UniProtKB/Swiss-Prot annotation:
Residue(s) carrying 3,3-dimethylmethionine: M141
Other noteworthy facts: The name 'proteusin' is inspired by Proteus, a Greek shape-shifting sea god. Compared to polytheonamide B, polytheonamide A has an additional sulfoxide moiety at Met-141, which arises from spontaneous oxidation during polytheonamide isolation.
Organism: Bacterium symbiont subsp. Theonella swinhoei (strain pTSMAC1)
Annotated positions of the 2-oxo-5,5-dimethylhexanoate modification: T97
Modified residues (D-asparagine): N140, N142
Function: Antimicrobial peptide active against Gram-positive bacteria (MIC=4->125 ug/ml). May act by forming transmembrane ion channels, since the peptide rapidly depolarizes the bacterial cytoplasmic membrane, simultaneously decreasing the membrane potential and intracellular potassium contents.
Residues with PTM 3-methylvaline: V101, V103, V105, V117, V127
Entry PTM: Epimerization of most, and perhaps all, L- to D-amino acids is catalyzed by PoyD, when PoyA and PoyD are coexpressed in E.coli.
3-hydroxyvaline (Thr) found at: T113
Keywords: Antibiotic, Antimicrobial, D-amino acid, Hydroxylation, Methylation
Gene name of the encoded protein: poyA
BP GO terms, sorted: defense response to bacterium
Protein's recorded name: Polytheonamide B
Length: 145
């Protein structure tokens, strides 16, 4: 759910905002198709100034048409290893709300850096900073409480 100023606070909100922008703005859609990494980096920085997508992160855009529907199958939680947050990471997340961007064609289990860990597909993973990434692409956003 987006907060009162329409800032996305969940994966669904983030994806919806990008899709709506692409449908309204042909130039934005063109840029999203030709350089999704650049566009997602801009959107991420708008939400979390200074946040960076990992250099080795692959990003793909998959458009549906009348003959194709894309189902994102999350990574099995048994294939996700736990990572630990440093004290600095916890300090950055002290505000209690963080949006984790998981970019994954095959998705991935996700947990936000925030006041707790969210579970997706039964797996926990903590990553550094306000973004969560499990290589490949499709954007996941979660809100901590």
């Amino acid at each position: 759910m987006a907060d009162s100023d329409n800032t996305p606070t969940s994966r669904k909100d983030f994806e919806t905002a990008i899709i709506a922008k692409a449908w309204k703005d042909p130039e934005y859609l063109r840029r999203l198709r030709s350089n999704p990494r650049e566009v997602l980096q801009e959107e991420l920085e708008a939400l979390h100034p200074g946040a960076q997508l990992p250099d080795d992160l692959g990003i793909s855009i998959h458009e549906e048409d009348e003959n194709h529907v894309h189902l994102v199958m999350p990574r099995h939680p048994q294939n996700v290893s736990d990572q630990t947050l440093t004290d600095d990471d916890l300090d950055q997340a002290a505000g209690g709300t963080g949006i984790g961007v998981v970019v994954a064609v095959v998705a991935g289990a996700v947990a936000n850096t925030g006041a707790g860990v969210n579970q997706v597909a039964g797996g926990n993973i903590n990553v550094v900073g306000n973004i969560n990434v499990n290589a490949n692409v499709s954007v996941n956003m979660n809100q901590t409480t």
